[in-house]
Amino acid sequence: CGGLPPVKSGAYLINDEMIDRLVNRPTLDHASNLGAMISYSIANEIGVNSYIYDPVSVDESNKIAKVSGLKELDRVCLTHALNTRAMAIKYAKMHNKDYKNLNLIVAHLGGGISLNVHEKGRMVDFVTDEEGPFSPERAGKLPSKMLVDLCYSGKYTYEEMAKNIRGKGGIVSYLNTVNAKEVEERINNGDGYAKLIYDALALQVAKAIGELSTVVNGNVDAIIITGGIAYSKYMSESISNRVKFIAPVEIMPGENELEALAFGVLRVMNGEEEATVYRETDLIKA
């Protein structure tokens, strides 16, 4: 559910107020906004509750993490919160540890790439897909002065430039494909340029992990690499080799959103977690 203002992690009970926000004042136009609407409609018909869980707008970061470097612009926490937090909780259970006692860095590698640092159960800082590593179709962090020059060059319209950053940026801008498997096939066939771009992606992810490790003063219990691209041994090992000096690396591949939703709400139903009732007046900022 991408169109909500910043919210805390966990489950939210879907209600009329949430639907009104998503229909009339969404903060982000995204297909995931339909999930709450569809769920609420079905739940009302059969007389049960419906929930969202860890939407992309989860924001538990401290004020210091919002400072961007330009007064008019605050950093905005829009990350793959559902999968990254689910993998952090799953990692803790796998190792018989309490998630709330761990410091974890989770990197989600998919069509977009984002990272979070989890400090004792809270996602206190982040690297979004607009300010960090490039990905198969997103440009990530770009040189700001050169970007401004390109925007005002007359070469592109606003819509074209926005698409260049999200949709035509990243790997596809260099290699004309968004398919990581195809890139690896090209590397295996001796394509040196494909290797350069793919290795640059691995390096940028590793640098973002290193950046987030400073948030907890280097006290990191584990680094988790997840998302669809984490299935790639080449990519996972390339990143791991650069960051394993910080903390042990756990590869947990896949975009496990459906599992995360199911287990999140199951924890609510079992009394392990309590769902929050969505109210605009309670939000971090509305």
Regions found by a protein language model. Give the residues of each.
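Short beta-strand-loop/turn "lid" adjacent to the catalytic site in phosphate-handling enzymes
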Residues: 1-31, 60-65
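A glycine- and small-aliphatic-rich helix-loop capping segment at beta-alpha/alpha-beta transitions
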Residues: 10-21, 42, 46-48, 67-70, ...
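Glycine-rich phosphate-binding loop plus the immediately following alpha-helix
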Residues: 37-40, 52, 67, 72-101, ...
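General beta-strand structural signal in soluble alpha/beta enzymes
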Residues: 49-55, 105-107, 125-126, 251
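Adenine-nucleotide phosphate-binding core of ATP-dependent small-molecule kinases
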Residues: 163-218
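Glycine-rich phosphate-binding loops at beta-strand->alpha-helix junctions
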Residues: 220-239
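Glycine-rich phosphate-binding/hydrolytic loop that grips phosphoryl groups
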Residues: 230-231, 237, 250-286
